């Protein structure tokens, strides 16, 4: 390709001079931030070139200990196992079929050789289960998903939707991988709309069996993980049809889950009445064998109904402790939120890997610099900081938020507390959706931040991006999940006015309706001191104010439009508003958890580093939405400017401790195995990859 320099009529010297002058101009702006002196911004105001070397001395070990949590041991066991088994590491180039076999062998190795038994933790110690998932997902994301299908989806549905008889019969086989299985919910015509599923399970009282049928092509189970090659069983979601003595002859009891054997235990041949096709090569996650399932009058014993929320007796009588189809459906799906919790948590793991690679590379890579002086690290460019430092701060923010989600989920599994169930349901939907959308975008930013080298497959962004992309869709499409959060907020908003209680995560709404919705205070709207802007109270108030306003406004809009458009039409008319509300609420929860984590950090230097990151997270978000705050005069013009300047300053401060912040993730080398991310000897390792 013709280079730009070849087209330029200037001499090389002139051209270099111009570029250098432009760079110097940029750098000088960058090195001495043009902040107008303000008594309220003492630190910013005195920031000069020399202050750049003034850097927080962070106790990396203490920070790392605070971040890594209590399951370091099992994660290290997993990393050591795969490190010692090059034959189980996924090569850069691999065919779909080989990848599927390798992925199955990785799982078998993990379970039968390394002795890691994820299934034992699915119900009893979910925190440990998610730590395992994070570790195996960073070895190969296909492995993380394959493990999730086997233990969280197939195994989880058996133990969470079934009863003791199912646990007794299936637990060991699922645990040791003799009973490989699938989770067959989605159909060709219905993915997000699970209540629209058409597969039927009709009770035959004569034979005491259910008959599973795919009534039309649209009801073929589609995208089912483990179905194309390895699965022996499937949890099939189908409408339960019971014979009745009235004129209709049958009664549809709604969607229930059934265990359906799909392959012979000995020969692995597909069983009679079951047809299986391969969903083929995918954009990513090709280590997972997704398939399509069609059932033609497949008979299963009555006992195969997973009967925790609804049962059928020998004579065909239906019983349930829950009064309506909707309540039973809600309870069934409620038991499956573990998958979402796992995806949110794993997505933060992906974000850590990709931010680590991009930031290490940016510290190492040098381009341009002042004349006759060494080139500067690309992370010293304000633009690179702008791309990566708020991302690093966000990674920390999401880490603490998802750790909190996992804790709440574990508590919920133990207590079954009703309010906690509701809280975890909405929080897992919100965090899964928010974090996976963020990570998907961040992966592209990281690739671009590493220039051309970011595009080499060996440096991992391609596979991370392709494998992670679908996190936005499966276990609930993000746009659909955010609507659940919005619906929940509206429900609680309504309850609040009817004197109802609010669960923990939502409790700020109680105050917000009274405090935050009064007119913005004209005095505080003008406060622009650094102490004030870095005060968690200001930051949280700003987030809560935004959520409360969005909530109040959308509630009024829905009420107005529903008179003419009906409930469905009104919701659709306000859909974007509702999505913004849900995101705003989730950001508020994330900030609250980050502030709490900073407060609880025992080591002062680690705490100071976290505080920098937390302030950057908060102010960057406020700045990104500054129009909203300005529109209602929540911040005066000068305060908006001060927020912007402080955000840039914090970006720069976080850059100074970026190495310590990424090191604290303690990702092993073979996880961030991108050669460009190696700290020393980077380019020689990289050149070896291409054969020099
Ligand atoms: C690799 C992979 C693995 C999978 N594994 C499994 C598995 O093991 N088991 C299983 O059961 N399923 C599995 N799935 C299916 C997955 O769960 C579904 O794809 C997912 O639920 C989304 O459904 P859908 O594809 O029908 O999308 P749709 O629901 O058709 O969504 C398409 C688009 O429409 C939008 N949309 C839909 N409804 C609304 C609404 N109400 N408001 C606004 N926008 C809306 C969505 O935002 C989306 O952008 C897998 C899928 C893939 C790709």
Curated annotation (Swiss-Prot):
Active site, per annotation: 475 (proton acceptor)
- What reaction gets catalysed by this protein? a 2,3-saturated acyl-CoA + O2 = a (2E)-enoyl-CoA + H2O2
Give the highest taxon in the source lineage: Eukaryota
Name a GO CC annotation attached to this entry. peroxisome
Where in the sequence is the transit peptide found? 1-49
Location(s) in or outside the cell: Peroxisome
Cofactors, names only: FAD
* Reported function: Catalyzes the desaturation of long-chain acyl-CoAs to 2-trans-enoyl-CoAs. Active on substrates longer than C14 and mostly with C18-CoA. Activity on long-chain mono-unsaturated substrates is double than with the corresponding saturated substrates.
**Family recorded in the similarity comment:** Belongs to the acyl-CoA oxidase family.
Kindly give the PANTHER family that the UniProt entry links to this protein: ACYL-COENZYME A OXIDASE, ELECTRON TRANSPORT OXIDOREDUCTASE
Q: What is this protein called?
A: Acyl-coenzyme A oxidase 2, peroxisomal
- Give the source lineage, highest ranks first: Eukaryota, Viridiplantae, Streptophyta, Embryophyta, Tracheophyta
């Amino acid at each position: 390709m013709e280079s730009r320099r070849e087209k330029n009529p200037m001499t090389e010297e002139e051209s270099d001079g111009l570029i250098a002058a432009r760079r110097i101009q940029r750098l000088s702006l960058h090195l001495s931030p043009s902040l107008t002196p303000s008594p309220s911004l003492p630190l910013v105001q005195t920031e000069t070139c020399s202050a750049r070397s003034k850097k927080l001395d962070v106790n990396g070990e203490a920070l790392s200990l605070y971040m890594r949590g209590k399951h370091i041991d099992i994660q290290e066991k997993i990393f050591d196992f795969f490190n010692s088994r090059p034959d189980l590491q996924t090569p850069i180039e691999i065919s779909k079929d080989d990848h599927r076999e390798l992925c199955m062998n990785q799982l078998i190795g993990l379970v039968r050789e390394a002795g890691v038994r994820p299934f034992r933790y699915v119900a009893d110690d979910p925190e440990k289960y998610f730590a395992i998932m994070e570790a195996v997902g960073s070895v190969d994301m296909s492995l993380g998903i394959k493990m999730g299908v086997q233990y969280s989806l197939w195994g989880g549905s058996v133990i969470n939707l079934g009863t003791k008889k199912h646990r007794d019969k299936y637990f060991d086989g699922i645990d040791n991988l003799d009973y490989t299985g699938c989770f067959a919910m989605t159909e060709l015509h219905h993915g997000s709309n699970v209540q629209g599923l058409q597969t039927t399970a009709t009770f035959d009282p004569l034979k005491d069996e259910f008959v599973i049928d795919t009534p039309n092509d649209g009801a073929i189970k589609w995208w089912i993980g483990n179905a194309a090659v390895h699965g022996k069983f499937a949890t099939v979601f189908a409408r339960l049809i019971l014979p009745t003595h009235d004129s209709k002859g049958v009664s549809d009891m709604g969607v229930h889950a059934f265990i359906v054997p799909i392959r012979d235990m000995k020969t692995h041949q597909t069983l009679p009445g079951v047809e299986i096709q391969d969903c083929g090569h995918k954009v990513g996650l090709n280590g997972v064998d997704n398939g399509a399932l069609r059932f033609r009058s497949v008979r299963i014993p009555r006992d195969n109904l997973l009967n925790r929320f609804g049962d059928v007796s020998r004579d065909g009588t239906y019983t349930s402790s829950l009064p309506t189809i909707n309540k039973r459906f809600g309870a069934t799906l409620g038991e499956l939120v573990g998958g979402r919790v796992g995806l949110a948590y794993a997505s933060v793991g992906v974000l850590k890997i990709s931010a680590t690679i991009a930031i290490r590379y940016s510290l190492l890579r040098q381009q341009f610099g002042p004349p006759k002086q060494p080139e500067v690290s690309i992370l010293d460019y304000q633009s690179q900081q702008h791309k990566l430092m708020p991302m690093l701060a966000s990674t920390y923010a999401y880490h603490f938020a998802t750790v909190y989600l996992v804790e709440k989920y574990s508590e919920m599994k133990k207590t079954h507390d009703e309010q906690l169930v509701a809280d975890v349901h909405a929080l897992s939907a919100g965090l899964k959706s928010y974090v996976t959308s963020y990570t998907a975008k961040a992966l592209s930013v990281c690739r671009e931040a590493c220039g051309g080298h970011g595009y080499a497959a060996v440096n991992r962004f391609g596979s991370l991006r392709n494998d992670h992309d679908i996190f936005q869709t499966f276990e609930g499409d993000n746009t659909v999940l955010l609507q659940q959060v919005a619906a929940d907020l509206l429900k609680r908003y309504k309850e609040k006015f009817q004197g109802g209680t609010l669960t923990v995560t939502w409790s700020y709404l109680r105050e917000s309706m009274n405090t935050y919705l009064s007119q913005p205070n004209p005095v505080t709207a003008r406060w622009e001191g650094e102490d004030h802007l870095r005060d968690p109270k200001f930051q949280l108030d700003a987030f809560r104010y935004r959520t409360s306003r969005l909530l109040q406004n959308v509630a009024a809009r829905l009420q107005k439009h529903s008179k003419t458009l009906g409930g469905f039409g009104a919701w659709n008319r306000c859909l974007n508003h509702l999505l913004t509300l849900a995101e705003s609420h989730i950001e508020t929860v994330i900030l609250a958890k980050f502030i709490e984590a900073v407060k609880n950090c025992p080591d002062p230097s680690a705490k100071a580093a976290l505080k920098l990151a937390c302030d950057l997270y908060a102010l960057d978000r406020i700045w990104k939405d500054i129009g909203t705050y300005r529109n209602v005069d929540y911040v005066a013009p000068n305060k908006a400017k001060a927020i912007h300047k402080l955000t840039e300053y914090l970006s720069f401060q976080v850059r100074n401790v970026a190495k310590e912040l990424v090191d604290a993730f303690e990702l092993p080398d073979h996880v961030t195995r991108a050669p460009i991310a190696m700290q020393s000897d980077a380019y020689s390792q990289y050149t070896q990859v291409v054969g020099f």
